[in-house]
């Protein structure tokens, strides 16, 4: 496998497919590892949260829990719970589910550029 192929397959992990309003999916792709790297599922949950927001936001805080190991060969479903949509801050809880069980859970607080300009971020 060439370096270009490895890079293209690796970047594909960030392409989440919209299934429903607050549900996204990633189709498992083996890039040479059996288990999912924790940073991958963390990034994917943050991407899922961002996909539920219309205005540009920045991550302010991110609290997460690794619950079970993930399998690179199997798809992951990301469910987003819209906790709060405020003027400056937005809160989301995202669960990554594989084989019907949560493998990762996070709560993230995101803020707008206006909040950052006011020194709130």
What do these predicted ranges mean?
Residues 70-110:
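Hydrophobic/aromatic-rich structural module bridging two neighboring secondary-structure elements via a short loop
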Residues 1-75, 85:
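Hydrophobic, proline/glycine-rich low-complexity stretches
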